[in-house]
Amino acid sequence: MKGLRIKAPVLGYLLISLLAAPLAAAPLILQGETLSYRIAPDTLAISINKVQVSAGQPARQVDKLTRGEQEASWHWPAQDARVEVKLDGDDLLLTLVSDTPRQLAWYSLPKNQTHLSMAFGEGSRFSVRDSDWLGYVGDELAELNTHYDLKLPLWSQDAGKQTYSWILQTPYDNQLNFTRKGGRLQLSARHEFSSFNQQAPMVVRLSVGDDWLAGARRYREWLQAEGEWQSLADKFARIPAGRRLIGASHVYLWGDALLDRQDVKDWPGLQARLNQKPAWLQAFSGEEQEALAATAPEPWQQTLIMAGLNRLIASQLPLPAQQGPVSQSKVLALRQQWVRGQLGDLLVAQTRWGQGLSLPVIEALQQAGLHKLWLGTPQWTAALQQGYAVTAAQRLGYLVGSYDSYDTAILPGSNDSWLTAQIPPKIGKRCAIMEANGKPKPGFGGEGAYLNPGCTLPFAKSRMSELAKASGINSLFLDVDGTAMASNDYNPAHQQGSQAMIAARNARMAWVGERLRLVLGSEDGNALTSKPLMFAHGIQSWGFGWQDASMRKQAKSPYYLGKWWPDEAPQVFFQPARLKPRYLKTVFNPADRLPLYQAVFHDSVLNSHHWLLDNLKFPGIKEERALLGLLYNTPPLVNLSRSTLESRLPELVRLSDQFAPLHEALWDKALVGFRWRDGVGRVQETRFSDGSRLVANFSNSSIMLDGQKLPGKHLLVALKGKPVTLLTM
């Protein structure tokens, strides 16, 4: 047979084609202590002991390949990127580096993996073929950044006994993308190299474990080794008042107006005096004036009258929105003086005035047997004008915290009731985050502008100091900072990326503890902002359906959450609501939940619900939510007002009586284990570092467990050194 002859032009063409094509590199094998990693340099597909864990990307040209027994590196010339893989025990460290700005895709979920675990809030584990999760993730979580949208910068995948976890040691500038294809969720990951991160390396740790919490525990170990994890015990040692959080339920006290209807002792006299002042009546709406004319006003009419009266009081001495807490406290004192002079003989003693944060409410909490509470005020004016209540609450051992925020600045006069957004115009303009188009980044709700936390730090220090001094609070809830929300800021005066912005948020929060000695909480309590925080709200029940009109806008919808009215008990916080089946499954179904966050931070940050989603918001699943909180050993959160004490206080007492003794026993213990006891997730067990166990039966049927009968909707409590007991919901 004659040999194949190739003419010179054809040969040249073939050589050029071969050079242009990706250079196929043989798969690399790295042998760990018990695991064998197979890595394709051209696609970055990865298998562990012959199980594929990343399908990688389309093939890329490879050069400069070097390899050793425990590591290898190579170059992707077309992407101007360098790749390094290195064993760390049985973990694999993957490092990507690029000297030029670019987005670099590196991971895709292989088809053999059937379940994903992620911390959108506390933690979820779901099938990639579940129809509810296909809809929820596809519609609301299709694109996630890993420093903000994920509360832990990791995800796990499994298809059986072993769990494969991707832990982002570089949590910034990453994006996860979900797509839907063939009735299955597909997941991919990419990293952005830019001038904001100065092309710093992206490092991810791939770890293998035998249970669903393995990745979270490995992340905790890594944080501790890096000095980025701090125990509650250490935090309390620096600020002893923090110990008041042990066993404490969390309560928001609503209503910051000066007077409540229960402060009136002579209704006929009040009606007569108001009707004698035509100028005063101009502050009352038509409906309020009708109530004022009633012979014997019913409670609902009294509430209307008080709304008009409080508006009248505010109009007599307007609050200087731009002048800060000290000036505002002086105006609030003048209002009290004005009311005493004009109406004092018709009212109870001034010490007992008030709506949410008031002496009668504090006394009611004490008389109900509630010994440990965190009390928050949604507006700092309540704390400024209710000194008697603040002092009484702290004497009883409660924490009293005000809400504050430095995230958005609005123009003067645009919304004077939004006190935290009243940032001096010069600071608001100078510190506004600038988008790539050169325009300020719109603030919360599209109003004003979002602010760079580093730029506003001097102003924030000054105002927080004023607030602490003027109000006497011993706690502070600093909104947004704990979420790790960050973006690239193109403002030449303070240009920075996500990592620097989150560092600035942490610096602001750390200052509160170091200088003001306040017990600090914030929203979410993201892993990247956990170190300065003692508590946070938003992980146990996280926000969902933000764009769902049936929940947010359509008042006749059965799923409507409520209006932001009335001020003393806004419907959105107090009105019972139903859940759409999608959210009942994805956000609240115990079988779809996983204590990932608690496995990392149970003994570091106390975490509860988002204030829009308190324990009483959804009556249909009230028992399941309470039981899940006990299983995870996390505090309940309840919205309360003076007018809702009768209906809500017994619920708070029940929740607190069950939670407090468990938390007092377990607050400083790590959550180290979790398992289903029935195979379907209706009976679940958590295990703590001292050997204590909690077992929750979410079903309506009894089950025999280790020789013990566990009825439906009950919690089995097996604390170290104590007899086994049962709690009923």
Task: Give the label of every model feature segment.
Residues 1-13:
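Bacterial N-terminal signal peptides that target proteins for export
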Residues 39-46, 186-205, 209-213, 258-268, ...:
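Active-site-proximal substrate-binding groove within the catalytic cores of carbohydrate-active enzymes
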Residues 372-374, 447-450, 494:
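Short, basic, glycine/proline-bearing loop/turn elements
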